[in-house]
Each structure stands twice: as structure tokens, then as C-alpha cells.
């Protein structure tokens, strides 16, 4: 311990005075020719010879002279190495270095000038540093072994884990009930007597957990839910829980409490199942005609449930059918209105044809009998004309016509549309060709006609913007023809 204290004092002297190890308060270094001092050498040998005796040397901070080179220099009798300048010192002056890390700080001069004792000391130091490094590595390995990393899962493991989670927590809607949430299935202990007929319903196609699926046979009426299914030994297997598939070839599902329940019933795949068609208490049929009358919908409603009847959306075919029906009714209504509108026009055409054929008395009578002139002529206003009798004079009186028109059918006058004008010349008859009097001219149109003529003048008695003048009176009747009268108006006919 005294040697260590002396070495520490020398280090302080070298640090602050910058002198050699031999200059100072410490003992002077012996000359090469002189004998070693007996009082100081044995303690150094005892210190150097026992490096592994458990004594530890305090490690100096970075920037100070290492202790081991100083001790080696003291033992060899050579001057101690000068301290390194501050510029060459490590950057971290406050960090603590391990014994193994302090070895590179040794000066190469001290290594070259050291004798066998210093070599042995360096070997012991290297051994101690290697042991400390091994201990530090072992401690680091032990500390690293204490930290456990999470296992890395592959894609297959991820899928398997997700599948397990989904199996534990299946997807369901808001009001959906899972199989394990349904009430338990009642145990059926029904055995049919021998006199009751059994018919094959189908064959067990698959067994899925607690469900048994039966594929029905062809040419059989479909049975409804709650129908009791029997085995070949006439014992009841269970009731139909659900039906799916086409109507002509449905699939029936039997529900049990567990797979052990199915095994206790002795149900196996490819086994034929039966039903009792004559037992109304055990068999319920599905009437397909009634199903066709019901309106169904494949659209999902709230929470993936079936929509109520008021929220059903029917197919496009039904909408198209309704649209065609509405269009057909509209077309029929238009045709009806058009036929009612064209009836007066047809009468007017007949009047026009009869007017052109008035040269014959019979045609004249036929043309004016049972005719209705709605566009300007009315049966109520004009009486039937008799054969050979001219109309009375008061018929052509304008005052009488005005009073009759205004008091007869005022609404018809307002509703009559504007019609084109048909100017027909009055016929000229030769009195020598007709033994009878000529037919009277056609009655004039009423004063309410809506068309205008270039030379039209307002009637003096009517305050109407468009009115026709009164027709001229018929020509006076000529005297009867005579053979001796040469002053006849018409002259002889040759």
C-alpha cells in the first residue's frame, strides 16, 4: 500500500510540475551501475508478485497518466513516461474505462524498456483484462438472455390464429340467433305401428356438427317444417328444422343438440329417411300454388332481415306491366274523346253531300230528315221540311232568329269551334223541267258562326263582332206556264 501511495504522489508531481519521475519528493531513481536499494525493492516485488491477491487499483480518469506504466518504470529503474498532452487525450474526460480499455493507453517506450518483470506484469494485466472482458461478456449475454423477444408468426400461423378467433366469435346480425343460443331440441320417442305406411323422403347427404342434411327424392310433394322424420326401424329421428333449395328438389335440415346426440340416434351418411304421408299430425305439406300468390323480395332490409310488406320492392316486370296498363287506359280515353269529337263532323259531311244532291225531291227529303246540324244547325231550332212546301217567311226573319238563337241554346253557341266557310251558290231551276215547285234553298247559317268574310258587316240588331247578314228572301213564284204567252220571263224551251 505504501508503494501505491508513493506512485500516486509521483503522478500528481508529474501532472502539475511536468518533470521526470526522478525529480521531486519521491526517491531518486538508481543509476544503472548502482545496486538496487534493499529497502524499496522487496515491496515492489511483493506488489508485482501478487496481482491476483484481490487488491484492486483505482482507475484514473481519462487524461491522467495510467498507473501501470508508472509502476513498471519504478520497477525497472527508468524514468517515468511524460504525460500525454491534453489535445491527445480522449474526448470523454469523465467516462470510466475498464481495465481492458486502459491497455491501449500504454506508451510504447515503456513496453520496449521494460524487463522481464514488466513483461510478467503485463501478462498478468492481460490475463486480468481478459478475465474481466469474459466476465463482462458473460454478464452481457446473461442480460441479453433475460430479455425475451416476441415470436415471429408466419402467414400460415396468422391465418390459423384468425380462423380460431373467428370460430370463437362468429359473425352475426343484430337479431340473429346462433345454433348454441337456440333452445334445446326435444327428444322424440315416437314409434309408428306396422299398419301405417312409410314413404322414403330422401337420403342423408351430410352431417355438419349438430345438423343433419337430407336430400329429397324427386317426384315427391315437398313437406313443411315441423314434419316428423322416421328411420327405417319406424322410430322418430327428428323434426325438420329448415328447408332450402329448389321447390322440385328441396333439402331438409334436422337439428340436434350435439354431435353425440346424432350418434345416439344412429344416423349415418347415405341412410334413407322416411315420412308418414297419411299421418296429418306428423306430416305437413307445402302448397306451391299458395306460394306463387305471395309476393317475395330478395332485398335485405335493416340488420340484414327480411323487409316488411309495406317496404317490399317488386320486380321490374310488374312495374313495366303497370306502366303498360296506364298507357293503354290513356290511349283508350283519347280514342273515346276523339270519337265524340268527330261525330258532328261526320254529320256535317253528310249534310254537304246531301246539299250537292238536292236536285231531286226525294234526295232533298232524305237529306233533311233526321239530320242534326251541330256545327251551326240544330234539330230543335229548325223543324223538318215537308215535300213541296217552302219554309214560312217568319223563319227568315232576322229578329225571330236572334230571339230564337239567344233563348234556345246559348251554351252551344259559345262552345262551337270555328269552322271553315263553304260558299255554295244558289241553284237555278228551269220551271219548264219541273212540274212542281223547286225545293227551297238551304237554311242560312246562324249568326254565331265564328268565321269572317271580306265583305262581312255587323248585323244591325246584334252587338256581335262577327255576324252574317240576313239571307235574301226567296224569289217570287212565277205564274204557271202557258203556250200562248210569248212574253214569259223564261221563254219557250226547244
UniProtKB/Swiss-Prot annotation:
Matching Gene3D superfamilies? Probable tRNA pseudouridine synthase domain
Q: Where is the composition biased (Acidic residues)?
A: 112-126
Mark out the compositionally biased spans (Pro residues): 29-41, 467-482
Q: Bias category Basic and acidic residues: which stretches?
A: 296-305
Q: Name one Pfam family in it.
A: Gar1
User: Which residue stretches belong to region Disordered?
Assistant: 18-159, 296-347, 462-494
What protein family does this chain belong to? Belongs to the NAF1 family.
- What protein name is recorded for this chain? H/ACA ribonucleoprotein complex non-core subunit NAF1
Q: Which organism is it from?
A: Homo sapiens (Human)
Amino acid at each position: 500500500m505504501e508503494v501505491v501511495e508513493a506512485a500516486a504522489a509521483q503522478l500528481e508531481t508529474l501532472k502539475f510540475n511536468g518533470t521526470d519521475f526522478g525529480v521531486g519528493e519521491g526517491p531518486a531513481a538508481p543509476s544503472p551501475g548502482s545496486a538496487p536499494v534493499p529497502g524499496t525493492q522487496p515491496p515492489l516485488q511483493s506488489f508485482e508478485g501478487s496481482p491476483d491477491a484481490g487488491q484492486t487499483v483505482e482507475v484514473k480518469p481519462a487524461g491522467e497518466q495510467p498507473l501501470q506504466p508508472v509502476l513498471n518504470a519504478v520497477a525497472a529503474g527508468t524514468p517515468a513516461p511524460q504525460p500525454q498532452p491534453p489535445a491527445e487525450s480522449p474526448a470523454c474526460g469523465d467516462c470510466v474505462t475498464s481495465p481492458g480499455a486502459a491497455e491501449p493507453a500504454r506508451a510504447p517506450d515503456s513496453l520496449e524498456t521494460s524487463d522481464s518483470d514488466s513483461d510478467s506484469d503485463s501478462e498478468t494485466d492481460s490475463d486480468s483484462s481478459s478475465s474481466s472482458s469474459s466476465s463482462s461478456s458473460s454478464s452481457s449475454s446473461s442480460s441479453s438472455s433475460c430479455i425475451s423477444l416476441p415470436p415471429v408468426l408466419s402467414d400460415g400461423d396468422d391465418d390459423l390464429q384468425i380462423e380460431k378467433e373467428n370460430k370463437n366469435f362468429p359473425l352475426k346480425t343484430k337479431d340473429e340467433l346462433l345454433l348454441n343460443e337456440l333452445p334445446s331440441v326435444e327428444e322424440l320417442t315416437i314409434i309408428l305401428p306396422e299398419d301405417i305406411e312409410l314413404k322414403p323422403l330422401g337420403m342423408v347427404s351430410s352431417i355438419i356438427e349438430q345438423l343433419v342434411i337430407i336430400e329429397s327424392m324427386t317426384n315427391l310433394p315437398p313437406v313443411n317444417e315441423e314434419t316428423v322424420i322416421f328411420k327405417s326401424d319406424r322410430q322418430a329421428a327428428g323434426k325438420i328444422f329448415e328447408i332450402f333449395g329448389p321447390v322440385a328438389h328441396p333439402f331438409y335440415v334436422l337439428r340436434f343438440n350435439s354431435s353425440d346426440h346424432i350418434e345416439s340416434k344412429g344416423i349415418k351418411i347415405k341412410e334413407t329417411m322416411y315420412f308418414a304421408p297419411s299421418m296429418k299430425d306428423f306430416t305437413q305439406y307445402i302448397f306451391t300454388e299458395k306460394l306463387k300468390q305471395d309476393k317475395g323480395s330478395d332485398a335485405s332490409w335493416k340488420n340484414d332481415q327480411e323487409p316488411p310488406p309495406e317496404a317490399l320492392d317488386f320486380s321490374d316486370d310488374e312495374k313495366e306491366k303497370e306502366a303498360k296498363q296506364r298507357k293503354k287506359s290513356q290511349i283508350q280515353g283519347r280514342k273515346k274523346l276523339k270519337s265524340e269529337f268527330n261525330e258532328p263532323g261526320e254529320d256535317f259531311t253528310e249534310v254537304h253531300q246531301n246539299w250537292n244532291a238536292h236536285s231531286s225531291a226525294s234526295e232533298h227529303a232524305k237529306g233533311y230528315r233526321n239530320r242534326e246540324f251541330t256545327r251551326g244547325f240544330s234539330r230543335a231550332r229548325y223543324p223538318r221540311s215537308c215535300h213541296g212546301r217552302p219554309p214560312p217567311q217568319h223563319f227568315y226573319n232576322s229578329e225571330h232568329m236572334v230571339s230564337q238563337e239567344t233563348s234556345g241554346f246559348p251554351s252551344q253557341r259559345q262552345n262551337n269551334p270555328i269552322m271553315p266557310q263553304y260558299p255554295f251558290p244558289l241553284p237555278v231551276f228551269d220551271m219548264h223541267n219541273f212540274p212542281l215547285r223547286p225545293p227551297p234553298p238551304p237554311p242560312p247559317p246562324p249568326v254565331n258562326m265564328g268565321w269572317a268574310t271580306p265583305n262581312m258587316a255587323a248585323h244591325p240588331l246584334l252587338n256581335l263582332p262577327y255576324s252574317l247578314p240576313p239571307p235574301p228572301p226567296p224569289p217570287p213564284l212565277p205564274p204557271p206556264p202557258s203556250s200562248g204567252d210569248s212574253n214569259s220571263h223564261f221563254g219557250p224551251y226547244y
